[in-house]
Design a protein with these regions (language model features):
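A cross-kingdom marker for long, charged
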Residues: 234-291
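Bacterial N-terminal signal peptides
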Residues: 9-21
């Protein structure tokens, strides 16, 4: 199977396609304004994992955060204590009966053993092993979720006594991954293994480190999302399309109320015809890229 070299939202340095048609602004992480007269919602595409001191905060973003009465996230990452998160991961991400090495081609098993301690992940489900493996380069470069945009914004919003809301729970997210067809999970893991072994083949929507430079410049991949849709349609549908449609429905309801709200979700959710800006524009709202 032929895979695209890069997919925005995952570890990658140079993105091949840009999301166009929304206008341009000075280089900064991408943000849109959705409005209908007395209501406005800002959409900000985050990176969940960043290195310390990544210079992503801009005066415009800070003004929007100050103005917003409600601040949205994919999930409330600050609400899960380590023990609860560990239990969720064990419930949805482990498979004591089917070793990973029995599910992968021999070449992938050999490559995986060179990349990590196979014994530690042998009884993880493929999606969980892929997620852990894809995060290792970011961690090695000093990036953490604690310094990521989502948790940084959450702390700021709470300190300013904003209403903090989430589209999903952490369990919703774990259940979504666990519900992927086994073949899609294995394809995802194989892609991550290949990427670590030979360089980028398919950049999947969980972000290690080097996308940071492109994200800071406001760049979003379009062709890469198309590649994901073609090569792993079940993952594309579960991770992006269905969630984006559900979130757009929620936000359309919010547009019935006057005021300003701020949405912070992974940057990949902003890309392409199934991205939040396009979905809300299709509902008749004015959508403009402001950063």
């Amino acid at each position: 199977m032929a895979y695209a070299r890069r997919l925005a939202g995952v570890a990658g340095a140079i993105l091949l396609g840009w999301l166009g048609g929304w206008g341009t602004a000075e280089a900064a992480p991408a943000m849109w304004r959705v409005s209908d007269g007395d209501s406005q919602i800002y959409l900000f595409g985050t990176l969940h994992v960043l290195k310390p001191q990544a210079p992503w905060r801009t005066p415009l973003y800070d003004r929007v955060l100050a103005e917003a009465t409600t601040v949205w996230f994919e999930a409330d990452l600050s609400s899960g204590d380590p023990d609860s998160v560990r239990l969720l991961f064990q419930r949805y991400g482990s498979d004591p009966d089917t070793p990973l090495s029995h599910q992968l081609p021999p070449a992938d098993v050999q490559a995986l053993a060179r990349q990590t301690d196979l014994a530690r992940i042998e009884h993880l489900r493929p999606w969980a092993a892929a997620l852990m493996l894809s995060m290792q380069p970011a961690v090695a470069r000093g990036a953490t979720a604690e310094k990521g945009a989502d948790l940084t914004i959450t702390r700021a919003a709470r300190s300013e006594r904003k209403e903090v809301r989430a589209f999903e729970t952490l369990e919703d997210q774990a259940r979504m991954f666990a519900g992927l067809p086994q073949s899609s999970q294995v394809a995802y893991l194989s892609s991550v293994i290949h990427e670590r072994r030979k360089g980028p083949r398919l950049r999947l929507p969980f972000q290690p480190a080097s996308l940071e430079t492109a994200w800071l410049g406001g760049h979003l991949g379009a062709g890469e999302v198309t590649a994901l849709q073609a090569d792993n349609p079940a993952l594309y549908d579960a991770f992006l399309k269905r969630r984006n449609v559900a979130w757009a429905d929620r936000l359309a309801g919010e547009m019935d109320r006057p005021g300003t709200e701020l949405v912070n979700v992974g940057a990949l959710h902003m890309v392409g015809p199934d991205g939040l800006p396009a979905l809300l524009a299709a509902r008749g709202y004015r959508v403009e890229r402001v950063q």
